[in-house]
């Protein structure tokens, strides 16, 4: 990114790579994750203040192990090698790396030797997080051994004159007691960064960039009302105003009042050009009689493409398509070390013959940064902090066929759940919460009469990133209020159940 201090992280396949980048940005210093294949010349052109070599799953002795351009070490730019990165640095400078009989994984206690630069003002003994197979058994000549541990005699090294540093542990992981302090020392004391990166100056720079790219031409954006597409629309509108047109497809599978809310915020408050497509009947017709969850997803995804294509083809002189691709999407799909390759299409995978130039202004930001950006742009909290919501909408929160009656039950019950969770002050504490209709009826008694009505399920989970989750311990009195309201205020419900399954073995969504 232009006009900002950059700390470059080279990716060698560690599961913690994104954490390194995140930690640096938390200091107010811009950081990017790039392939380990970058050449020294390419890095020189990027002009970073510092370079971090990440950890990785390989042994340096594996035939296909990842290596970097060794010219990096001669650029005069400070380098911090983490785990595998320290081993590469050691090999380059004639140190010795050996395979360990047993992989070291977990917490370890290190002891400092003297007062190393990166460990300034931290205790002599401290807990760190190890995750390695190989280890450095002889430090390179002219390098100091800064820390040791019982199982890793060389846990940290440095050559202060050359601004080269290495740690065998992972400072980016919270389990490392003084990891943030170590990274902070590297970024500010060694690299000389000032910490001038913020969402505010991101807005200024990105607005200027969009204006230069678009000129007097027009941009199309698929607006769902979700966090990413909403923030993209707000940012681009700030840059080019009426040159932006948004298409909002209401497929009838949204949450209560969601469609109206999107139109109020963006058409009325932001004064954007929005084309709202009421496609409810079209989608429900296609879903009639369909119970298989994967088939439901496929039908909805394909139909969205057709609807969007129909509307886009009516517009004249559109040159650009805006998408809410995030930095996590770029990392997952674009690095050489990615274990799982994903294709990210925020509008569901548009036809290949739609000849637009993509604009992805959020593709250097993480989710929490996007939320902060949205707040800075004036997007209301109720949208910025929206619950994660699947593309197929309420259709996959209904087990079995999607009907008007089933949608109404899920829509009303979900609204009550969200209202009560917010009243209890739990809406920022719980990662995701929603109701699901399992399509099960049971016998009950209401008003002295027998009933035979639907069961509604509540799903609420806590999580850091959605990859794993645990069921949320909602207080009993809150659950009682929710249950009472669901049974009394939603037609055709006489029983409420709470899902107490973690992920794994279950997924967060039921379908």
Curated annotation (Swiss-Prot):
It catalyses: XMP + L-glutamine + ATP + H2O = GMP + L-glutamate + AMP + diphosphate + 2 H(+). Keywords: ATP-binding, Glutamine amidotransferase, GMP biosynthesis, Ligase, Nucleotide-binding, Purine biosynthesis. GO terms for molecular function: ATP binding; GMP synthase activity. The active site is at residues 83, 170, 172. InterPro entries: Class_I_gatase-like, GATASE, GMP_synth_C, GMP_synth_GATase, GMP_synthase, GMPS_ATP_PPase_dom, NAD/GMP_synthase, Rossmann-like_a/b/a_fold. Pathway: Purine metabolism; GMP biosynthesis; GMP from XMP (L-Gln route): step 1/1. Pfam families: GATase, GMP_synt_C, NAD_synthase. One of its GO terms (cellular component) is cytosol. Residues 197-386 form the GMPS ATP-PPase domain. Residues 6-196 form the Glutamine amidotransferase type-1 domain. HAMAP family: GMP_synthase. Homodimer. Catalyzes the synthesis of GMP from XMP. This is GMP synthase [glutamine-hydrolyzing]. It comes from Oceanobacillus iheyensis (strain DSM 14371 / CIP 107618 / JCM 11309 / KCTC 3954 / HTE831). The lineage of its organism: Bacteria, Bacillati, Bacillota, Bacilli, Bacillales. The gene is guaA.
